[in-house]
């Protein structure tokens, strides 16, 4: 059973997140392992597996990137996050300058104005990628979606690196 069916959602990329949450909690109430504590071991095992499936499905559909990769998989495209970045060299070369800006920030002790500027640039790129992914899914251009996901992964990664480096800097000055 696919996760869209499990949560009684239409099989499309853009989902009603409120409905997803409502259906998740309904399923949790119905299949929570604690409710079956007095049942047979085989029944408890089945319920536990169902509960794990419900939790995994919820986490997959709730997260934009995971939902995109799952939806691609449902449509016959096997996508692995680990290899996506390596396949988009032109993009990586084009945006390597963001890492240079990060290095400059570190050298300048994370100047607030420069930090805010870089954070805004990255966040705008993330939002743009997400909108492009939604649009390409609507047009069923799955190969384009895969390419944009690799770009989104890059921006998410540099956002995480920036946050990590800034936190290291803050610990050093305190």
From Swiss-Prot:
Top-rank taxon of the source lineage equals Bacteria
Q: Which GO terms describe its biological process?
A: [2Fe-2S] cluster assembly; protein complex oligomerization; protein folding
Which InterPro entries did the record assign? DnaJ_domain (IPR001623), HscB (IPR004640), HscB_C_sf (IPR036386), HscB_oligo_C (IPR009073), J_dom_sf (IPR036869)
Give every J domain span.
Answer: 2-74
User: In the record, what terms sit under GO molecular function?
Assistant: ATPase activator activity; protein-folding chaperone binding
Question: What quaternary arrangement does the UniProt entry report?
Answer: Interacts with HscA and stimulates its ATPase activity. Interacts with IscU.
Query: Which HAMAP family did the record assign?
Result: HscB
Family indicated by similarity:
Belongs to the HscB family.
Q: What is this protein called?
A: Co-chaperone protein HscB
Q: What is the protein's species of origin? A: Buchnera aphidicola subsp. Acyrthosiphon pisum (strain Tuc7)
